[in-house]
Amino acid sequence: MIRRSPLVAVILFVAITHVVLALDDATRIDSSEIVPSEPTRRTRVSPHYISSGGSKRSLRQQAFRPVAYLKNKLNWFLSRFFGTPTDAFTQMNSPRSSRIANIFRKIYMHTAKDDEYFSRLRSV
């Protein structure tokens, strides 16, 4: 049973990665679908014109919010599995580490390099 636990972790990691990438592709919205074709519009309450730039930004943020949430969850899960990126780098250079685990450590280090939590840890 102990020998199968890394295999289960790898299978879970691959499944979570596929779900995150599938949601990333599914939530991409073209700007022509978000913003109406006319550049400005009038509101019923006030007679002044409102540019559509703000609505485009808010709709785009709403569209990408689930993917950002899942990426943060994935980084959290990987940080519990591998530790900090510095720990993962140290384990990767160890002569006793396996090649498959090193592949996932590289993926983890690549996804965690832009994360706020890890950038705060590096600056301390």
From Swiss-Prot:
Record's subcellular location: Secreted; Host cytoplasm; Host nucleus
Domain of life, source organism: Eukaryota
Major subcellular location class: secreted
Record flagged with keyword Secreted: yes
Keyword Acetylation set for record: no
Domain free text: Has a conserved RxLR motif that acts to carry the protein into the host cell cytoplasm. Lacks the 'so-called' EER motif, which is found closely behind the RxLR motif in most of RxLR effector family members, but the presence of an EER motif is not always essential for the translocation of every RxLR effector into host cells, or for inducing a hypersensitive response.
Task performed by this protein: Effector that acts as a broad suppressor of cell death to interrupt plant immunity. Inhibits cell death induced by cell death-inducing proteins, including the PAMP elicitor INF1 from P.infestans.
Lineage, opening ranks: Eukaryota, Sar, Stramenopiles, Oomycota, Peronosporales
Conditions for induction: Expression is up-regulated at later stages of infection.
Protein name per its UniProtKB record: Secreted RxLR effector protein 49
Record's keyword terms, sorted: Host cytoplasm, Host nucleus, Secreted, Signal, Virulence
Residue window of motif RxLR: 57-60
Segment forming the signal sequence: 1-22
GO cellular component terms attached to this protein's record: extracellular region; host cell cytoplasm; host cell nucleus
Family the entry assigns: Belongs to the RxLR effector family.
